[in-house]
Amino acid sequence: MIYELRIYHCAPGRLPDLNKRFETITLKLWERFGIRPVGFWTVMIGESNHDLYYMLEWKDLAERESLFGAFATDPEWLKARAETEQNGPLTTSISNTMLSPTSYSKMQ
C-alpha cells in the first residue's frame, strides 16, 4: 500500500464550505469510484487553522492514477465543484505527498 497525504490550504473563511462539500458530495462520489480515505483532520494547534489534511490509501500508483483521474474528470464532480465555488475558490493551493510505509509501520 501507499498513502497520499493531501493538504488543502483554504481561502480565508472557506474551510466550513470545503468541509461541507467533502461531507455531502465528495465522499459519496469517492465511494462510487472506489477511492478509500483513511482520515480527515483540521489544525487544532499549529501554523494554519485554514487547512484541511486528509489521507487516501492506494494499492499502487497505477490505481491512484486510474481512480483519481476518473473522479477528477467526472461530470457530476465538475458540476458540483463549479456550484460550490460560485463565490470563489475554496482553496488557495493544494499540497500533495505520496508516502510509502516503513518496515516498522503498523500501516502497511
Predicted regions and their residues:
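Short amphipathic alpha-helical segments
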Residues: R14-F40, A72
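Short, well-ordered beta-strand segments in beta-rich or mixed alpha/beta enzyme
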Residues: Y3-H9, G39-D74, S95-L99
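Short loop/beta submotifs within extracellular cysteine-rich repeat domains
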Residues: Y3-E4, R14-P16, T26-L29, L61-R64, ...
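Glycine-rich beta-strand-turn "strand-cap" elements at beta-sheet edges
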Residues: F33-H50, L78-Q108
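Short, flexible helix/strand-to-coil boundary loops that buttress conserved ligand/catalytic motifs
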Residues: F22, F68, R81
